[in-house]
Amino acid sequence: MDQPRTHSGPTTASNPAPSSTNSSSAPSATNSKQERSSSSLSKPSSVVPSKDSPDGDAIAKTQAAALKNDMKSGDTSTLDGSSQNIIPNRASMQKYIDQSSDLLSRSSGVITPSMSLNASTNATNNDSSGNSANSSDLKIPIDRDNTIFKTFDTKTGQFLKNDDNEEEIRRNNKVDSIPPKNIYTNINNPSPSPPPSSKQPPSASAPQLPPATEPHKEQAAQQQPPGNASNFLRIFSNKKMRSHSVPTILHSSLRKLSSHNQYYRNQNILLNHPTPSGISKKKFSRNHHQPYLHSNNPLSSNPLSLKRAIFLNQQISGNASTNANNDNINNSTATSMTNQSFLSSSNFDLTLEDRINYIKATPTPVPFPPINLQGLKEIDLQEILKNPQLRHDIIFDPLLQFRPNLDGERGNKKRQLANIYWNDVQNEIYVYSKRPEIFQYNRSRLVPLFDTLRDVLLTIVPQKESPMINNVLDTELNIQELLKGSLIMSNLSGWLADLFKHHCAPMRDPWVDKMSNKFKEAERDSSLTRLIEGLRLVFQILETMKLDIANHQIRILRPALLSNAVEFEKQYFNTLIASKRVNLNTSLLWFDKKFNENVTAGLVRNPSSITIPDVYNICIRSIINLLSCRKMVREYPTPLSFDHARLILLRADIRQIVCILVCRLLFQQLVANDPSMDKATKEYVIHTYSTKRLKNEIISIITDEHGNCRWTKNTMSIAVHLCKVIDDLHREYDNNGSCEQARRPQLPSLDNSKITFAKSWLSKQTQPLSEVYGVLENRVFKSLEDAIFNRSECTIDGRVKQDFVYLYNTNNGNVGSTNTLSTTTDTASVKISPSLMSPSKTSTTTPTGNAIASRGLFAATELEEFENVYRHLYALINLHWSVFGPHYIEMLGDKVNKKGI
């Protein structure tokens, strides 16, 4: 039964039938084409014939008579035991709609797809003979076996020719292609179906497919009398299924996101390897999808067809070497969105039955699109305000932004899952074009696809535009038009393009135009592949719009989020501790151990009277020691759970600082031990070659193509470079400071023994366990500890300065990054006292001059990495102390002198 093309919805209990003065359910002859217009944002409403007209009077009489007969026959059903809420059964509603629509078509002389040839011919003959029988006795025969599902050409007024094979298939099936709105009928099993219950498992609510070896049972079931309407109707539940798709959001926390194993299931089916249950539980414990193959599934005994379907779907988007061949295959089987007539191709070794069996094996609930409302929920404003990791990271990153997580292994898996989903959608559209009666509402991916498109749009556009969105993106109507061949996707894409350009940033306009052109190309070239590409672009644009909105909200709300960042984190962890969801015992034991070690080592100024500032200093030292490469820690304390990734990156920066200082120490040793230089020459060489220049040149040598620093593998290159720099600066000084003469091409004069010594020394001292490395690392840690303690100004009651919250502001140039902590910053925002970085007393050389003395051997203040590490540690340690400092002091008890508090 064709669903009436009106958006008024099905007849409700309070309004069982339209009145004679307002027959809005019957379309007029002038609007029989029912075209979508890209310039209109809403669908056209039906034109109602006047009661005074002959057609209108006949329709009114027919409707009244039909309703009267239905009421007399008592063939009605009530809801909630109320006798007033009357809904006609399927047979009555079928007869009522068919009579009304055929009478209008008879008067207009136009044959619509909902009429049969016999009915239209009889109606025309009766009308021309002037037979004005009573409307109550009017019986228009409707031959449901010869229902036409051809494409109607709106320009010529004729139906387009269709394949005889398709006509024979549709004539044999004798079923509708889509169920009525808000209800569905089990096509293959017309037995009574009770309403689904929320307590039943999903498999129980899904229609059971009959075995392929018993076609006589299906024919016998189709010949049964209609009976009561409740035996044929099943009301859909309005409850939305939860989406188990992978979230596509990544922020600076580098938080691990869970993913489902649908891709691995497909691979296991393809390779015929069962998934080990232990691994499945361990890796995919959050997955709630049912497996593809069930014990009661008719395909479980012979999965060959399903494997071939999966292989074909993956092959379409697989190797780049077969892209040209795949395009030819897809184009040969493509569809025209105006004609919806798919051509069969001899290139396919996959039969239509294999495709149908693959669709029937779809698990329930049906998978959602890769970009769905559940995955985008994380970036809603309410979720942003409740996200503790984001509230923590925003302190360190002023330009914190959401972006799609397509990096690394998770990104590759996400792309593979998306390709599988869209290939399945492409397969469904192809099958439904050949066999529309195969469509099942609860097993089609098209239903959640259109629902997700509408739901995501409703979260983006203003509330006043919601009725328009619901009207245009009517899922059931769009699917019905898609199955009948009347859905013009180019018009729908044009409407979406106008809507996107109106609400998204202008920089997204080229992307929107690309999406619209994809649909136009699909219609022009009859390409199903381009149609799927256009649908993918639609969802990608929706995701980008949601991300833009979320990033704008974060940027606007950042000052407010920073103002109560400490209080929010305090409340968050106190709530977890009170509910016993977080156990701090191990963390408290860790701090107590560090406290005892510092007291035993004599690192406390007055062990007999330890104050709260002393405890704060121990906290600084304990956290900094977690960054040591000599004593690598595998786990961090629970209070530092939000800073795991940040601490790992800080440890890499610490190693880079120490290795640069090792190279600087080697450079000064080579200069000091060179007998060919006098004192003035040595001072000139050391003064000219600054630590910053040394760092830039060495980093360019040791960095590989992936951006990783390889110190131990490039010791020979570093040794040659340092010897070459010393030789060049020596000749430059001898030539009265002329760089041009020193850099003239000359024969190499490097000493091989010096290069060998430098290489051997670097290979040993760049190892974290070497003594020189340990001395330099401790020196860096001591400088960081003193700088943080002096700036914090910890009071006697343990309060520290709260300026760390606003340390990273864009107006100071302190722009953070989500992937690296080594960023260029403004040195004026964090000023380090020169006394903290004074030259080492154990230096092998004693340079003269104020500039050389202020730089010295351990002049780490010239390194941007040191400034970056200092800022991050200053904010991290003070935030940690503000939240967990009271717990540490309470745990120490009488060990701390609390006088004056």
Curated annotation (Swiss-Prot):
Family matches, as InterPro entries: Tcp11
Biased segments, Low complexity type = 10-51, 116-138
**Residue positions where Phosphoserine is found in the record:** S40, S53, S191, S193, S245
Cite a single GO BP annotation: cAMP/PKA signal transduction
* Residue ranges, compositional bias (Polar residues): 74-87, 106-115, 220-231
Chain intervals for the UniProt region annotation (Disordered): 1-87, 106-139, 162-231
Q: Which domain of life is it from?
A: Eukaryota
Is-annotated flag, keyword Nucleus?
yes
The entry's keywords? Nucleus, Phosphoprotein
Q: Any one cellular component term from GO for this entry?
A: nucleus
Please state where this protein is localized: Nucleus
What is the stated purpose of this protein?
High copy suppressor of a cyclic AMP-dependent protein kinase mutant.
Question: What family classification does the UniProt entry report for this protein?
Answer: Belongs to the TCP11 family.
Name this polypeptide is given: Protein SOK1
Q: What is the native source organism of this protein?
A: Saccharomyces cerevisiae (strain ATCC 204508 / S288c) (Baker's yeast)
- Point out the gene that encodes the protein: SOK1
